[in-house]
């Protein structure tokens, strides 16, 4: 998946007449301090019961495979650091990894656009 696909999914959800957008947080354009990137949306979707329909809030975290890989590995590293007495502070290294992954994604997306043209 490419970065543009994240926004395509967002746009398609926004076009749905039965989905209500409550909140959008774009951590791709504005990454979190630790380097985390993702598009978060809180939406209300219809859930059908026997006698009624109810709009239920749902949080979506939409990201590319590379963003998901970074988030999973970052979580694993932070979790392990909680239980070790002598650990290095990896925050700068994690941010750098996030930046490098994002740059690679951008390059891959440019190559894909060139091939699609």
Q: In which residue ranges do the predicted regions lie?
A:
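Long beta-strand-rich cores associated with HINT superfamily self-processing modules
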Residues: 1-108
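Eukaryotic low-complexity, non-globular regulatory regions
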Residues: 109-117
